[in-house]
C-alpha cells in the first residue's frame, strides 16, 4: 500500500516544527477540531503537508474559491509528486439554475456549460478515494452538493482481468451501461472503439492513458495501457477497473423502481393542486413530469434528472444527499483553508438553494421531492465532517467556539516580521499616499491601496495617473485571466501601484509589495472589520521593508484590535529572531509562480505548457509575417490556442497569447 512521501528540499523552521508536532499530537489524541493560526507567509501549506505525511491519512482540503483551490492543488502536487493529489471543484464554466419569477411570470430554463477537463478530474478524485489511501483531494464548497451515492456508483463498476471469459457483445453492453459511447472517429474520454477482437477504451477519469483489451475466442488475452494519440503501449496490465462516465449513473432496475415512486408522488401532488384549484400548475406539472418519465425509461436519463435524486438514491424524504464526504474513509482528515471565509460559505449554500426551489414547487414546475436535491445543511455537514484542522491568519467565531486546540504559527521560516502599522489622518490621505508612493517607486518597490467604494477606487486611480504614477485598478468586473495578468505586471514592474476595494480576497502573494495603504480605515463594516484589516495588512508581510498605513480620523475598535494583534505577532517574531541570531531574508519568488496551481494540469496539458514558451519567443518569427493575410491567419491560430489554454485554466499562458494577438492586430491596422 502506498504511503505519503513528502518531497522537498526545505526543513521545517521558525514556528513550523512546534506547530506540526502539536497538530499531529492533537490528531492522534482524537481532538475533533484544531486551529492552525498562521500568519501570511509562515508556510501553513508546508506545515499541513508535514502533518499529512506523519499521520498517513487520506485528506480533504477545503478552499474558499477555485483560484485558491488551484494554488493549493499546485503546491500539494509539488510536495507529493508520487501520491494521488486530486482536484474536485464545480465542473460548470457557466451555470444558470432553473428558476421562476412570479412577479413577471418568467420561467428561466436551466442552462449550463460543463468543463470536460474538470469533470475528468472529479472522476479521478473519487476513484483515488475508492482505490487508495494516499489521496489528497483539494476541493471547494461544491463538495457539499449532491453526488451519486458511492454504493450505486460501485455497483456499476466493470472489472476486467486477464484470462476472464468475456463475450464481446456483453462487454460492449456493459460499457454502454457506464454511459460510454462507441466512436470510431474521435477517440476521446468515455468513448470506445472496436477493431475485430481488439477493443480500445478511453477511461472517463483519465486524460493521458487509454486501455486496450485483446480478446481471443471470448477470453481476455491481453490488457495494456497505451497513449491514445501515438498508440505507444506503456505497460501490460493484469487487470483494470472501469468506472462510470458520471457519478449519477444508475442501474436499470433502480431506474424502474424510481419511476414507480415518481408516478406515485405525481398522483398525490396533482390531487393536492386540483383541490386547491391550481389548475394551471397541475397541468404544467403533469406535462413536465410525464415527459421526464418517458425520457428516463427510453434513455436512462433526462434533463434535470437530479431533481429526482431522492428516488434514484433510495433516500427517505428530508435525508441528506450523498456527497463527496460519503466517499471518504472514516479516519480521513479535513483541512479547511481560510476557514474564516470557507465555513460561513457552507451554511449559506442551503438557504439560497431552498428559496429558489420552493418557488418552483409552489408554481407547478417541480414536485416537492425536488427539494431533496440540495446541498447539505450546516448541521448535516458538521455530522459527517471527520477530524478537522481550521487554517487561517484570522480565525472566525465558529473556529474559536469549536477548536479544541489553537496552534500558533507566527514566526516565519525566512525571519520576516509583520509590517509596521501606522495611523495617519484621513483628511490629507490622498496627498500623503502620493508622497509615500514616490518614495517606494524610487526604491523599486510596489504599493497596494485599498478603498471603500468602486467610485473612489476609480477616482484615486485617475488622480494618481494624472500625477505620472503608473497605476492600475483591480475590481470585480475583471475576469480571472486579466486579473492574473494585472498581478503579474505589478510584480514585473510594468506599473507600480495597484488600487482595489477588497484586495485581500484575491489571495495575493507579492513579495515586491512594501506598502499597503488602507484609506478610510475608520469606517466600520465588512471591509474594515478586524479580520479584513489583518488580512490586508498581511499583504505587505513578504517584504523586508513592509509597512501598512491606516488613514483614519478616529481609531475604531476593529482598528485597535488589528493593530494590537499585528504588534503582538511582530514582537514575538523579533524576539525569536534575536534569540536565534536570525537575519530576516526577503521572499524570492519567480514571477511565473503566481498562479502555479491554477493550471490544474493532467500530463497532456503539461505537455501543452511547452506551447507557452512559443509565446515568449514569438517576436522572433512574427517578423516573418509580411502580408495582412498571413497576419490574419496567425491571429486565428493564436486565438484557438488561447481558448484552449483558458479551458485548461492555464491563465498565464492565455494572457501571454492575448497580448501577442493585440500586437498583431495593431500591425494589421497599421499595414
From Swiss-Prot:
Short sequence motif Beta-hairpin: positions: 91-114
Keyword terms: ATP-binding, Cytoplasm, DNA damage, DNA excision, DNA repair, Excision nuclease, Nucleotide-binding, SOS response
GO MF assignments: ATP binding; ATP hydrolysis activity; DNA binding; excinuclease ABC activity
Binding residues annotated for ATP, in chain numbering: 38-45
Domain annotation Helicase C-terminal: ranges: 429-582
BP GO annotations: nucleotide-excision repair; SOS response
Domain UVR positions: 632-667
Cellular localization per UniProt: Cytoplasm
GO CC field: cytoplasm; excinuclease repair complex
Subunit structure: Forms a heterotetramer with UvrA during the search for lesions. Interacts with UvrC in an incision complex.
Free-text comment about domains: The beta-hairpin motif is involved in DNA binding.
Role: The UvrABC repair system catalyzes the recognition and processing of DNA lesions. A damage recognition complex composed of 2 UvrA and 2 UvrB subunits scans DNA for abnormalities. Upon binding of the UvrA(2)B(2) complex to a putative damaged site, the DNA wraps around one UvrB monomer. DNA wrap is dependent on ATP binding by UvrB and probably causes local melting of the DNA helix, facilitating insertion of UvrB beta-hairpin between the DNA strands. Then UvrB probes one DNA strand for the presence of a lesion.
Family in the record: Belongs to the UvrB family.
Protein name: UvrABC system protein B
Amino acid at each position: 500500500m502506498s504511503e505519503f512521501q513528502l518531497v522537498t528540499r526545505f526543513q521545517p523552521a521558525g514556528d513550523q516544527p512546534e506547530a506540526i508536532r502539536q497538530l499531529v499530537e492533537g490528531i492522534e489524541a482524537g481532538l475533533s477540531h484544531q486551529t492552525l493560526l498562521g500568519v501570511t507567509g509562515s508556510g501553513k501549506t508546508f506545515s499541513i503537508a508535514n502533518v499529512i505525511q506523519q499521520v498517513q491519512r487520506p485528506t480533504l482540503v477545503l478552499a474558499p474559491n477555485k483560484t485558491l483551490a488551484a494554488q493549493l492543488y499546485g503546491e500539494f502536487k509539488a510536495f507529493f509528486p508520487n501520491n494521488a493529489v486530486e482536484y474536485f471543484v464545480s465542473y460548470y464554466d457557466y451555470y444558470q439554475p432553473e428558476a421562476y419569477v412570479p412577479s413577471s411570470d418568467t420561467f428561466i430554463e436551466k442552462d449550463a456549460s460543463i468543463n470536460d477537463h474538470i469533470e475528468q478530474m472529479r472522476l479521478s478524485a473519487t476513484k483515488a478515494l475508492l482505490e487508495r489511501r494516499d489521496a489528497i483531494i483539494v476541493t471547494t464548497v461544491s463538495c457539499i452538493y449532491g453526488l451519486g451515492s458511492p454504493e450505486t456508483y460501485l455497483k456499476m463498476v466493470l472489472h476486467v482481468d486477464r484470462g476472464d471469459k468475456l463475450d464481446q457483445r456483453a462487454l460492449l453492453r456493459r460499457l454502454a451501461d457506464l454511459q460510454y459511447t462507441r466512436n470510431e472517429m474521435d477517440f476521446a474520454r468515455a468513448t470506445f472503439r472496436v477493431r475485430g477482437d481488439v477493443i480500445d477504451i478511453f477511461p472517463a477519469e483519465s486524460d493521458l492513458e487509454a486501455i486496450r483489451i485483446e480478446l481471443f475466442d471470448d477470453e481476455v488475452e491481453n490488457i495494456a495501457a497505451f497513449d491514445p494519440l501515438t498508440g505507444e503501449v506503456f505497460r501490460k496490465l493484469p487487470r483494470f477497473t472501469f468506472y462510470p462516465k458520471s457519478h449519477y449513473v444508475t442501474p436499470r432496475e433502480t431506474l424502474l423502481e424510481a419511476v414507480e415512486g415518481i408516478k406515485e408522488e405525481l398522483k398525490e401532488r396533482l390531487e393536492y393542486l386540483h383541490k386547491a384549484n391550481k389548475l394551471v400548475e397541475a397541468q404544467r406539472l403533469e406535462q413536465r413530469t410525464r415527459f421526464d418519465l418517458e425520457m428516463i425509461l427510453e434513455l436512462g436519463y433526462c434533463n434535470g434528472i437530479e431533481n429526482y435524486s431522492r428516488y434514484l438514491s433510495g433516500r427517505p424524504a428530508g435525508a441528506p444527499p450523498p456527497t463527496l464526504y460519503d466517499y471518504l474513509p472514516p479516519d480521513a482528515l479535513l483541512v479547511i483553508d481560510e476557514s474564516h471565509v470557507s465555513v460561513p460559505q457552507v451554511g449559506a449554500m442551503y438557504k439560497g438553494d431552498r428559496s429558489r426551489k420552493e418557488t418552483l414547487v409552489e408554481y407547478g414546475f417541480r414536485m416537492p421531492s425536488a427539494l431533496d436535491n440540495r446541498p447539505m445543511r450546516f448541521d448535516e455537514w458538521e455530522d459527517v465532517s471527520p477530524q478537522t484542522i481550521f487554517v487561517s491568519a484570522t480565525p472566525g467565531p465558529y473556529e474559536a467556539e469549536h477548536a479544541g486546540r489553537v496552534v500558533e504559527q507566527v514566526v516565519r521560516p525566512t525571519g520576516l516580521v509583520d509590517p509596521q502599522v501606522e495611523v495617519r489622518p484621513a483628511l490629507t490621505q490622498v496627498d500623503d499616499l502620493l508622497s509615500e508612493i514616490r518614495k517606494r517607486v524610487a526604491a523599486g518597490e510596489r504599493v497596494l491601496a485599498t478603498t471603500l467604494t468602486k467610485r473612489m477606487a476609480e477616482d484615486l486611480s485617475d488622480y494618481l495617473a494624472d500625477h505620472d504614477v503608473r497605476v492600475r485598478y483591480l475590481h470585480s468586473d475583471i475576469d480571472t485571466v486579466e486579473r492574473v495578468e494585472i498581478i503579474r505586471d505589478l510584480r514585473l514592474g510594468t506599473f507600480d501601484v495597484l488600487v482595489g476595494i477588497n484586495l485581500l480576497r484575491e489571495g495575493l502573494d507579492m513579495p515586491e509589495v512594501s506598502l499597503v495603504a488602507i484609506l478610510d480605515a475608520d469606517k466600520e463594516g465588512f471591509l474594515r472589520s478586524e479580520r479584513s484589516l489583518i488580512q490586508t495588512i498581511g499583504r505587505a508581510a513578504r517584504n523586508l521593508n513592509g509597512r501598512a498605513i491606516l488613514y483614519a480620523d478616529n481609531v475604531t475598535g476593529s482598528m485597535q484590535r488589528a493593530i494590537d494583534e499585528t504588534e503582538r505577532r511582530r514582537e514575538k517574531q523579533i524576539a525569536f529572531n534575536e534569540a536565534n541570531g536570525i537575519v530576516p531574508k526577503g521572499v524570492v519568488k519567480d514571477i511565473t509562480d503566481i498562479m502555479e496551481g491554477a493550471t490544474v494540469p493532467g500530463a497532456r496539458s503539461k505537455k501543452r505548457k511547452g506551447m507557452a514558451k512559443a509565446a515568449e519567443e514569438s517576436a522572433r518569427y512574427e517578423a516573418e509575417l509580411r502580408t495582412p493575410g498571413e497576419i490574419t491567419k496567425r491571429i486565428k491560430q493564436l486565438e484557438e490556442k488561447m481558448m484552449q489554454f483558458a479551458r485548461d485554466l492555464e491563465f498565464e499562458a492565455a494572457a501571454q497569447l492575448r497580448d501577442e494577438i493585440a500586437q498583431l492586430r495593431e500591425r494589421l491596422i497599421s499595414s
